[in-house]
Design a protein with these regions (language model features):
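Hydrophobic adenine-recognition pocket in adenosine-nucleotide-binding enzymes
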Residues: 103
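A conserved beta-strand element that flanks and buttresses the S-adenosyl-L-methionine
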Residues: 99
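Class I (Rossmann-like) S-adenosyl-L-methionine-dependent methyltransferase catalytic domain
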Residues: 1-89, 107-114, 118, 122-177
Length: 177
C-alpha cells in the first residue's frame, strides 16, 4: 500500500520472524494445542510464520488498522480482526500467550496502560510486549527524531515502573534507538 496508510513497502520478509519463532516455541512451550494472540498484528506476518512452524496452533490477531487486516496474508486473514487494544474482544484468559510487538507505545499513556491490562486479562499468564525505550538523553533524542508514532515515551526504568503500576506481569523487551 501507499504511505498514507503507513504501510508503504510493508511486505512479508521471512528473515524477520522465522528465526524467532523457535525461541517463542521453546520459551512458552508452544504446541499444536496452544493459542496465541498478536495485539497489533498488522498484516499477520508473525502469525503466518508461527502457524507454519507449529501446525495446528490457534492463532488470532487484532489491529486497529482496517487497511492492514484487509491486506493481510491470506494464510491467516480469517483469524485477524480490526479491534482496539484497549478493549480486546475476547473473554478473560482466552489465550495461552499474548504478544504485542512495538504497538502499545503508540498509544497515549492512559490508553497504553489499558492496553497492557487487556493483554494481561486475555492471557492465561504468559505475555510479551516490546516497546521503544531509552537509557540516557542521547538515546531519547534519537528516539524522538526516529519514532514519530510513539505517544508513550519512557525510559527503561520508567517502563518497569509503569508495568507494575498497571498490573502487567508478562515478559517485556525494549527497542533502544
Amino acid at each position: 500500500g501507499d504511505r498514507r496508510h503507513g504501510y508503504g513497502g510493508f511486505n512479508y520478509q521471512p528473515r524477520f520472524w522465522q528465526p524467532v519463532i523457535p525461541t517463542f516455541e521453546k520459551h512458552w512451550g508452544l504446541s499444536a494445542i496452544s493459542s496465541v494472540l498478536d495485539v497489533g498484528c498488522a498484516k499477520g506476518f508473525m502469525l503466518h510464520d508461527l502457524a507454519a512452524h507449529i501446525p495446528g496452533i490457534t492463532v488470532r490477531g487484532v489491529d486497529v488498522s482496517a487497511y492492514a487486516i484487509a491486506h493481510a496474508m491470506e494464510s491467516v486473514q480469517a483469524h485477524l480482526q480490526v479491534a482496539d487494544a484497549q478493549s480486546l474482544p475476547f473473554a478473560d484468559r482466552s489465550f495461552d500467550v499474548v504478544i504485542s510487538i512495538n504497538t502499545v507505545h503508540n498509544l497515549e499513556r492512559e490508553a497504553c496502560g489499558r492496553a497492557l491490562q487487556e493483554i494481561q486479562r486475555v492471557s492465561r499468564g504468559q505475555a510479551f510486549v516490546t516497546v521503544d525505550a531509552y537509557r540516557n538523553e542521547r538515546e531519547r533524542e534519537r528516539m524522538m527524531a526516529w519514532n514519530l508514532t510513539a505517544k508513550t515515551i519512557l525510559s527503561v526504568d520508567e517502563w518497569v515502573q509503569f508495568f507494575e503500576e498497571v498490573g502487567y506481569r508478562g515478559d517485556y523487551f525494549w527497542f533502544i534507538p
